[in-house]
Structures are given as C-alpha cells and as structure tokens.
C-alpha cells in the first residue's frame, strides 16, 4: 500500500475537500501540511454539509487527523471550528486531532497587518485578510510564537515583546495603533489549555504510524499555481503548495509521501487578482459560474471562470511529480455544445507551451484553443465510466493526453459517492 499526497493542480478550489473525504475512507491518518484557514472546503456526507478551513477533512470520517508543522494556526479559529463541527455531531477529541507542537500561530496583529497592507496597496493581491502571509513572514524571520510556547508563559512574555518590536515599526508605517503586548499575552493564556490539549510532536506520531504500516493521506490546501515559488507571483499565497511541501510540512521524509494525486477541475477557476489567460466573461463563463456554484467557501467571493487550461495543468504535473489526477466537476460541462481546451499561449510573435515566470509575459499570454464537441446528456451522478456519453469520454481522454497524466478518479457531483474510481491511489 502507498501513502497518498493530494494537491491542487490549478489555482485552488478544485474540489480537494470531496476527494480527500472520499479517500479518507481508505486512509488511517489524514495530515494537513501547509497553509492556514484561508482555504475553505465543503464536504457533503449523507446529505449533511460540513465547511472546514483548518481542520483536516479526515475528522468528519473519524480518522486520526493531524495539523502539521507547515500549517500556520489561528488558535481562536481552530477552537471555533472544533466547536462548530461538534454542533454537527462530530466530537473533536485529542485522540482524533493532533496539532504539531512546532506549528506557528496566527495572531490578531497578523490580521491587522494583512488587512492594512491590502487596503494601502495599489496592487491588490486578493488576500483573504486572515493573517496567513504575515504569520509566515514571522516564521521565516524566526520571531513567531509557536504552539509549544503556550506551555511556557514566562518565556512567552519576552517573545511577545520581541515580536512587537518588529510589528511596532510596521504598524506605525501603516498608521495602525501600537499592539498591546499584555492583552495579547492574556488572550493566548485564555486559549492555551484547550489548544495544548491537542499538541504533541506530530512527526513522532506520523513516524510510528508509517512504520506500523498505516495508510497516510497528506492533504494540501489551495493549488500549485498559488505556490510562492511556482505560482503566478506575486499573486500567490505565502506558502509552498506543491507536493514537495508534504514532507517538510509534516516532518516525514520524502519517501513516505507516496502517490501524488493532483486535483483538477474540468474547467478553470481563480479567486482574486492575477493573470488568467483562459478566463471567460461571456455566457459560457456565466454558465460555469452558475452551474458550478463558483463562490468561495470562506470569503463568499465569486470565482473567475474559464476553459480548461492544459498548459497550466501539464506544468503542475511536472512540478508536483503527479502520478494521476482526480478530474472534478465534469457535470458542469453538461449542455455546452462546444468545449475548448487551452493548449498553448501566443505571446507577441512567439508560441509557448508553458507559463513564463515574468508577469509581463503572463499578462500578455493569449490562449490557443483546441475545440471539441460537447454533449447534451447528463453526466451528473455517474458512478461508472461506462455511464458517460461518448463525447464526455473523449474529453476525459484528451485531457489525459494533453497533461501527461492519467485520470485516476472522476467526480460527477458534490456527493461523496458520485465518484468513478479508475485507479486506486493507495495501490500506488
């Protein structure tokens, strides 16, 4: 049996939540390894809707769930999410949820900074304003407050002072009032007992699980095109979202992260600012937005929609080392007479088959499309490949050819069971 790493292969919102939930039935442990509570996902289980942003999807299945050291954790949001899920009948105990004791915390001052910067900037990034970026800055700057620090109040006080010395200068430059260190200390001490109940060295637990032969599912957030190194910089998130981060963000060696499953929509969406060559602002774009219900779980922002971009996904396949993909929302294409797939870009007098790193070229890129015949038959709820009409099958096969990876799973509705298994990722 192989472990499985799940990553988004586009700009996020590909349907990772449903696929991870579906795979959780086959896993023993589910691990979040990067990001924060800026990437929400919706799970539909037995008609009940669960909306998660920080908790691993495995909690809904009652599977051991781990928030790894690569995640930045807002302790107040964590407890709120735990309480909300508990109200839906899922008790989140320390036996079910483990929080890496070396994970860094998101504090109120991080949110202040995030929102003030976005408001003051002439170049909007489209941040969620939840403090994720500033929290990662403090982590890299070696001044972050970590989960383990909550267990040592006396040592925490000077760490807060050092942190505020840095943030004070930033806040003054943005016209924000000074942060209150004593108030922050009291806030942290108030939540410390509940947070610390879940904390332990996650890497040790995962190492033992791996050696015991337990199946581990690594759950990525957002998508490869939002990766701080490989995405459409600077319109990216503040962490590495690619499969390689599964190792660093969990404390497990690269050989343990196993089969890489990329999650891919049958079309393309993006939230916030940044280049998007295949974007549509016509009736087809409205169809994708309306039928696909393309609104952000966390922010409520409408997602920008466009045709499937094989150039971007092929690049994601290479960067992530993707073995196979889960193709989601195929049913959203039902009823479209003609489908288009972006197979290259025209930039000035050049034709390229990859996304250039420079923002000028990214913005100038014009899509080169290949057209395919659509279908009128419904694919919604299909649970077998033979249930798909001929044109839908042709579309899936052409996507495989263009991205250089096979389709391992096919999703035909938000319901967990409306999933066609073509190859079990846990079989490697």
Swiss-Prot record:
GTP binds at residues 12-18, 40-42, 303, 329-331, 411-413. It is found in: Cytoplasm. IMP binds at residues 13-16, 38-41, 128, 142, 222, 237, 301. Substrate binds at residues 297-303. GO terms for cellular component: cytoplasm. Binds 1 Mg(2+) ion per subunit. It holds the Pfam family Adenylsucc_synt. Mg(2+) binds at residues 13, 40. Its cofactor is Mg(2+). SUPFAM superfamilies: P-loop containing nucleoside triphosphate hydrolases. One of its GO terms (molecular function) is magnesium ion binding. Keywords: Cytoplasm, GTP-binding, Ligase, Magnesium, Metal-binding, Nucleotide-binding, Purine biosynthesis. Its EC number is 6.3.4.4. It catalyses: IMP + L-aspartate + GTP = N(6)-(1,2-dicarboxyethyl)-AMP + GDP + phosphate + 2 H(+). InterPro entries: Adenylosuccin_syn_GTP-bd (IPR018220), Adenylosuccin_syn_Lys_AS (IPR033128), Adenylosuccinate_synth_dom1 (IPR042109), Adenylosuccinate_synth_dom2 (IPR042110), Adenylosuccinate_synth_dom3 (IPR042111), Adenylosuccinate_synthetase (IPR001114), P-loop_NTPase (IPR027417). Pathway: Purine metabolism; AMP biosynthesis via de novo pathway; AMP from IMP: step 1/2. GO terms for biological process: 'de novo' AMP biosynthetic process; IMP metabolic process. Its main location: cytoplasm. Plays an important role in the de novo pathway of purine nucleotide biosynthesis. Catalyzes the first committed step in the biosynthesis of AMP from IMP. Belongs to the adenylosuccinate synthetase family. HAMAP family: Adenylosucc_synth. Homodimer. This is Adenylosuccinate synthetase.
